Swiss-Prot record:
<feature type="site" description="Stabilizes the basic form of H active site to accept a proton">
    <location>
        <position position="95"/>
    </location>
</feature>
<comment type="subunit">
    <text>Monomer.</text>
</comment>
<keyword id="KW-0378">Hydrolase</keyword>
<feature type="site" description="Discriminates between blocked and unblocked aminoacyl-tRNA">
    <location>
        <position position="12"/>
    </location>
</feature>
<dbReference type="GO" id="GO:0072344">
    <property type="term" value="P:rescue of stalled ribosome"/>
</dbReference>
<comment type="function">
    <text>Catalyzes the release of premature peptidyl moieties from peptidyl-tRNA molecules trapped in stalled 50S ribosomal subunits, and thus maintains levels of free tRNAs and 50S ribosomes.</text>
</comment>
<dbReference type="GO" id="GO:0004045">
    <property type="term" value="F:peptidyl-tRNA hydrolase activity"/>
</dbReference>
<dbReference type="InterPro" id="IPR018171">
    <property type="entry name" value="Pept_tRNA_hydro_CS"/>
</dbReference>
<dbReference type="GO" id="GO:0005737">
    <property type="term" value="C:cytoplasm"/>
</dbReference>
<keyword id="KW-0963">Cytoplasm</keyword>
<dbReference type="GO" id="GO:0006515">
    <property type="term" value="P:protein quality control for misfolded or incompletely synthesized proteins"/>
</dbReference>
<feature type="binding site">
    <location>
        <position position="70"/>
    </location>
    <ligand>
        <name>tRNA</name>
    </ligand>
</feature>
<dbReference type="InterPro" id="IPR036416">
    <property type="entry name" value="Pept_tRNA_hydro_sf"/>
</dbReference>
<dbReference type="Pfam" id="PF01195">
    <property type="entry name" value="Pept_tRNA_hydro"/>
</dbReference>
<dbReference type="InterPro" id="IPR001328">
    <property type="entry name" value="Pept_tRNA_hydro"/>
</dbReference>
<feature type="binding site">
    <location>
        <position position="68"/>
    </location>
    <ligand>
        <name>tRNA</name>
    </ligand>
</feature>
<comment type="similarity">
    <text>Belongs to the PTH family.</text>
</comment>
Length: 195
C-alpha cells in the first residue's frame, strides 16, 4: 500500500508565473484539489498554499510553496516537520526538461537534475533524496543557455494540451497509487503519451 501523506506541486508565486512551464507541478496539485473538492488556501506557517484532502479514502496534505522555486524546501520542510511526515511519504510534482510534453513519470529518489526546487528540498531535508517525484515533461529548448527563459515562458497551445493530458493521466495514476501501489501506478502512467 502507498503511504504518501504530502503531495507538493512546485511553482513560482504570482499571476505572472501561473501559466509558465516551471509551474507544471502546481497544475497537478490544483487538479487534485479540484477533484477532492477542497480549496488551497494561503498558510504563512508553511510558506505556501495548503489543503487537507481525502484522496481515495486517504488523508493527504496538498502544498504549493509560495516561496520562489529555489526556496521550495523551506515550505516543504516546514509542513513535513510539523506533521512528522517522512521523506518517503512525500510526492513532489515538478516540470522536467528531459521529457517531452505529453509524458509524465513517477520516480523514487535520485538527484535534482539541475532543478532548483528539488535541489532546495533535498538540502532542507538534510540531504535526504528518498522522496517520490512526479516528473511532468515540458521539453527542452535545445540550448542550455536558453533554459531559464524557456521554463519561465508559456508553452504554445499544442504543447499545453499535451501537458494537460499528461497531468490528467497522472491524476488517474495517482488514484491507482492510493488504491493499489506505486508499481501499478507507474505501469499505467509510463505507458501513456499524449499525441
Amino acid at each position: 500500500m502507498c503511504d504518501i501523506k504530502l503531495i507538493v506541486g512546485l511553482a513560482n508565486p504570482g499571476a505572472e508565473y501561473a501559466q509558465t512551464r516551471h509551474n507544471a507541478g502546481a497544475w497537478y496539485v490544483e487538479e487534485l484539489a479540484r477533484i477532492a473538492n477542497v480549496s488551497l488556501a494561503p498558510d504563512p506557517k508553511y510558506f505556501g498554499l495548503t489543503a487537507r484532502a481525502i484522496l481515495c479514502g486517504k488523508d493527504v496534505r496538498l502544498l504549493i510553496p509560495s516561496t520562489f522555486m529555489n526556496l521550495s524546501g523551506k515550505s516543504v520542510a516546514a509542513l513535513a516537520n510539523f506533521f512528522r511526515i517522512e521523506p518517503e511519504q512525500i510526492l513532489v510534482a515538478h516540470d522536467e526538461l528531459d521529457m517531452e510534453p505529453g509524458v509524465a513519470r513517477f520516480k523514487l529518489g535520485g538527484g535534482h537534475g539541475g532543478h532548483n526546487g528539488l535541489k532546495d528540498i533535498i538540502a532542507k531535508m538534510g540531504n535526504n533524496k528518498n522522496f517520490y517525484r512526479l516528473r511532468i515533461g515540458i521539453g527542452h529548448p535545445g540550448d542550455k543557455n536558453k533554459v531559464s527563459g524557456y521554463v519561465l515562458g508559456k508553452a504554445p497551445a499544442t504543447e499545453q494540451e499535451k501537458m494537460n493530458a499528461a497531468i490528467d493521466e497522472a491524476v488517474r495514476s495517482t488514484e491507482i497509487l492510493f488504491k493499489q501501489d506505486m508499481t501499478k501506478a507507474m505501469h499505467r502512467l509510463h505507458s501513456f503519451k499524449a499525441e
